[in-house]
């Protein structure tokens, strides 16, 4: 059986409290000093020790890693050593890079063509920086439905998707098998939410040990187990002193006691096993609360933000302000609005600035 450790690495670009009335460039919306400060903190606590641990591991540790386009930008600007470490691990086959919307955005909730375009942008940037073109797709928070699977296959030519193993969709079936989308040839690798949540919520409290966790994994029947987490779980959400990296350090050794279990990348696992069944996902799933989109679309503020994004998208793209709009489409912003009026107000001010800039450029083009 194959064990895939899938990590999403992302640092959102934070919006300024009061953006300029009109944008000279898209990044005028951003609090760059805050972005750099937070990036450097997380890089020191999480990204550097994580990559060093993978490099030093002698028991076959591999990662499936999605690094958002905006985080890759920050690494280029403020942490080039991280790019070098990552490139080395990719070249050695220790890390498989996964592609998705460049801005870690909710593009799939807005327009199919936006999801396709942002993913192509992400693939191109990874190719430029790492010399590889990812063949595996995942959405932020593992958002997925049949429509996404069809787009990934037909428009992007990618054959593997990592998605949430929602009990609502699986029914009596287990997430520990390769499935196939009914709308395409896309192979689905499904996150095991129980094993994933055990690390997220149990590791920092001392409830999870590498030896007992390895034993649990070894007893699962199936083809593949996907444990999916934010990369920042290790070192940022769960500090090093609470055992975050010790768990990862010792897990490969403990798993080596069970020769039928091995670390794999998504491409390796998907090519090794034939799908056991088709899995129809008519309504979106995610790894968020409720295993659906309610954590992104359930509040009036979130509904209002989505309406604003839909209203401005075509106008922004045709006015040369695509990046500004795409920065506002970051999934983190929408997720945070469910409990924060302050986040929505920053978003609304930025949207007003974008709207004014669109109008100004329209007048200039007509003059």
Region locations from a protein language model:
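Short, well-structured secondary-structure segments
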Residues: 2-7, 13-111, 135-138, 159-164, ...
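Active-site and substrate-binding clefts of carbohydrate-active enzymes
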Residues: 2-45, 177-186, 190-193, 204-205, ...
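Short, solvent-exposed loop/turn segments at secondary-structure junctions
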Residues: 10-12, 69-73, 102-105, 142-145, ...
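Positively charged, amphipathic and often flexible ligand-engagement surfaces
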Residues: 106, 166-170, 189-207
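CE4/NodB-like, metal-dependent polysaccharide N-deacetylase domain
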Residues: 112-141, 215-228
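His/Asp/Glu-enriched short active-site or ligand-binding loop at hydrolase and phosphoryl-transfer sites
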Residues: 153-171
């Amino acid at each position: 059986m194959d064990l895939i450790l899938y990590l999403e690495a992302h640092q959102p670009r934070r919006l300024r409290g009061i953006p300029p009335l009109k944008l000279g460039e898209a990044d005028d919306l951003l609090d760059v000093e805050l972005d750099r400060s937070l990036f450097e903190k997380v890089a020191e606590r999480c990204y550097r020790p994580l990559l060093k641990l993978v490099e030093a591991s002698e028991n076959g540790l591999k990662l499936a890693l999605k690094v958002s386009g905006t985080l890759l930008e920050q690494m280029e600007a403020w942490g080039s050593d991280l790019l070098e470490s990552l490139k080395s691990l990719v070249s050695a086959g220790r890390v498989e890079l996964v592609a998705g919307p460049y801005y870690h955005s909710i593009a799939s909730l807005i327009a199919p063509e936006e999801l396709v375009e942002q993913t192509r942008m992400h693939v191109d940037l990874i190719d430029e920086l790492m010399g590889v073109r990812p063949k595996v797709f995942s959405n932020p928070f593992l958002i997925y439905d049949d429509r996404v699977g069809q787009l990934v296959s037909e428009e992007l030519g990618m054959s593997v998707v990592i998605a949430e193993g929602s009990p609502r969709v699986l029914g009596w079936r287990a997430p520990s098998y390769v499935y196939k989308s009914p709308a395409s040839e896309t192979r689905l690798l499904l996150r095991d939410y129980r094993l994933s949540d055990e690390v997220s919520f149990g590791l920092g409290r001392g409830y999870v040990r590498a030896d007992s966790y390895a034993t649990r994994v070894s007893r699962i029947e199936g083809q593949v187990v996907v444990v999916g987490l934010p990369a920042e779980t290790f070192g940022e959400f769960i500090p090093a002193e609470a055992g975050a990296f010790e768990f990862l350090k010792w897990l490969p050794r403990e798993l080596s006691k069970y020769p039928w279990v091995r670390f794999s990348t998504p491409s390796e696992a998907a090519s090794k096993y034939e799908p056991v069944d088709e899995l129809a996902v008519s309504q979106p799933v995610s790894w968020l609360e409720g295993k659906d989109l309610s954590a992104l679309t359930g509040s009036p503020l979130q509904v209002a933000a989505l309406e604003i994004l839909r209203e401005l998208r075509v106008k922004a793209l045709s006015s040369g302000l695509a990046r500004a709009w795409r920065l506002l489409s970051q999934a983190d912003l929408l997720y945070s609005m469910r409990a924060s009026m302050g986040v929505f107000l920053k978003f609304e001010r930025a949207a007003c600035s974008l709207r004014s800039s669109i109008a100004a450029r329209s007048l200039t083009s007509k003059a």
